[in-house]
Amino acid sequence: MSQDTEVDMKDVELNELEPEKQPMNAADGAAAGEKNGLVKIKVAEDETEAGVKFTGLSKEELLKVAGSPGWVRTRWALLLLFWLGWLGMLAGAVVIIVRAPRCRELPVQRWWHKGALYRIGDLQAFVGRDAGGIAGLKSHLEYLSTLKVKGLVLGPIHKNQKDEINETDLKQINPTLGSQEDFKDLLQSAKKKSIHIILDLTPNYQGQNAWFLPAQADIVATKMKEALSSWLQDGVDGFQFRDVGKLMNAPLYLAEWQNITKNLSEDRLLIAGTESSDLQQIVNILESTSDLLLTSSYLSNSTFTGERTESLVTRFLNATGSQWCSWSVSQAGLLADFIPDHLLRLYQLLLFTLPGTPVFSYGDELGLQGALPGQPAKAPLMPWNESSIFHIPRPVSLNMTVKGQNEDPGSLLTQFRRLSDLRGKERSLLHGDFHALSSSPDLFSYIRHWDQNERYLVVLNFRDSGRSARLGASNLPAGISLPASAKLLLSTDSARQSREEDTSLKLENLSLNPYEGLLLQFPFVA
């Protein structure tokens, strides 16, 4: 048998063994070669073994089972557990609400309570002698905005001929400084930056007596009432009067002017200034008029020790009671004119963290001094950059200018901005309680706290050598205590600030460098 015959026989056997693989419609001759179109049919092995399907309980059977004692008891048990759990959660919520400490009601806050005030007594010295006066001030509003100040105390800028009351017009702007339209534009621009304008209306600011002669008091009062109404209609947010100690019947006039100011809106501010550092005289002025801010030389009457500064602050707060305070070292001068250079950073920290409104003069954020060579002592030029002070015969150091300090993270300007930002957003610093801590004569330390908000600890070293602070908390009220450690937010020592910022410092033996102030933060603990 040939090889071809054997292949054919195998095909026949496969076709006989697997008929299901044959094409259903193939011709006889093509059946052997067709490989597609095959159909496989699976036949159940045993159709007779199909089981009976379970259709579940009928309605009658289900009701019978559900009504059995076992299921009834189960349902009642589950229902009882549900309601007991619900009542337990309700009771727990009530207990939490009842036992939780009550939040203190927030005090009424006006805009001058929420940040610092910035004084520009000499407009041309601030913007530059040839910078356009009031119009030039508009270009510096962005800079003031970065300082986070809430109000700008401007002037005096009204027409005043030295010691001539008839040539003094409190309603008109000195034409060398700008026009009424320039001032209205300034008001609108400042409003967009959320900066309020307070106008200084000290009448005879270029003369010997700021309020003219005592016999002319009635004439001054009449002019003042007319001017107040006029400027309020223009949109001014408040007024400042300096040297009120030289004004006859000052309490009477201040009360009258306050009524005029408040009649238009409660959101208007009145500021009085005095060169006096006598606490009783200051209190007498404050008691004459409600909601009055008073700037004075009270804090400059210091021997610059921690003990002396603490005494001044606590006596002032005790004497003024619940009345809102303001803090400055003078009614118009620069901080550096009254405070030594090595304490400027310390006093910035102090003024921003005491309860009340801090008041600064232009240049205080830089450490500007009034006695620089080539500058008038009462009105130093604002050092925007090296070329802006062309009257000085020698170059100005870069770190004395706004430009230079802007670029220095350890500068006095940077510290001012950080403190101003904290002062404006932290409730404990905005309107929190104040408690002085016992410490050594070289230190002044205190706590600011409000309800359940973050608390702040301020420690100031007035000594020219390092100190370890042992803080006594025995005089703190119930519910207030010092923690074992606190987070360092700010140090007036720029080297330490960059090295230890946001680190936790132990308070048991807190170490301070010479003339260093620390601002520390710790949380409320129920």
Swiss-Prot record:
Induction: Expression induced by concanavalin-A stimulation. Induced during cell activation but is subsequently maintained at constant levels throughout the cell cycle in exponentially growing cells.
GO cellular component, one term: nucleoplasm
Transmembrane segments: 76-99
A molecular function (GO) term: protein heterodimerization activity
Glycyl lysine isopeptide (Lys-Gly) (interchain with G-Cter in ubiquitin) cross-link, chain position(s): 42
Covalent link location (Glycyl lysine isopeptide (Lys-Gly) (interchain with G-Cter in SUMO2)): 59
Membrane topology: Single-pass type II membrane protein
SMART domains assigned to the protein according to its UniProt record, in alphabetical order: Aamy (SM00642)
Basic and acidic residues bias locations: 7-21
Topological domain spans for side Extracellular: 100-526
PTM notes: Phosphorylation on Ser-300 or Ser-302 and on Ser-420 by ecto-protein kinases favors heterotypic cell-cell interactions. N-glycosylated; N-glycosylation is crucial for trafficking and stability of SLC3A2 to the plasma membrane.
Location in or out of the cell: Apical cell membrane; Cell membrane; Cell junction; Lysosome membrane
UniProt modified residues of type Phosphothreonine: 5
Region ranges (Disordered): 1-31
Entry-listed glycosylation sites: 166, 259, 263, 301, 318, 385, 399, 509
GO biological process: carbohydrate metabolic process; isoleucine transport; L-alanine import across plasma membrane; L-histidine transport; L-leucine import across plasma membrane; L-leucine transport; methionine transport; phenylalanine transport
Entry-linked Pfam families: Alpha-amylase, SLC3A2_N
Cytoplasmic side: 1-75
Entry keywords, A to Z: Amino-acid transport, Cell junction, Cell membrane, Disulfide bond, Glycoprotein, Isopeptide bond, Lysosome, Membrane, Phosphoprotein, Signal-anchor, Transmembrane, Transmembrane helix, Transport, Ubl conjugation
Entry function: Acts as a chaperone that facilitates biogenesis and trafficking of functional transporters heterodimers to the plasma membrane. Forms heterodimer with SLC7 family transporters (SLC7A5, SLC7A6, SLC7A7, SLC7A8, SLC7A10 and SLC7A11), a group of amino-acid antiporters. Heterodimers function as amino acids exchangers, the specificity of the substrate depending on the SLC7A subunit. Heterodimers SLC3A2/SLC7A6 or SLC3A2/SLC7A7 mediate the uptake of dibasic amino acids.
Entries under PANTHER family matching the protein: 4F2 CELL-SURFACE ANTIGEN HEAVY CHAIN
Quaternary structure and partners: Disulfide-linked heterodimer with a non-glycosylated light chain (SLC7A5, SLC7A6, SLC7A7, SLC7A8, SLC7A10 or SLC7A11). Interacts with TLCD3A/CT120 and ICAM1. Constitutively and specifically associates with beta-1 integrins (alpha-2/beta-1, alpha-3/beta-1, alpha-5/beta-1 and alpha-6/beta-1), but minimally with alpha-4/beta-1. Interacts with LAPTM4B; recruits SLC3A2 and SLC7A5 to lysosomes to promote leucine uptake into these organelles and is required for mTORC1 activation.
Family that this chain belongs to: Belongs to the SLC3A transporter family.
Protein name as annotated: Amino acid transporter heavy chain SLC3A2
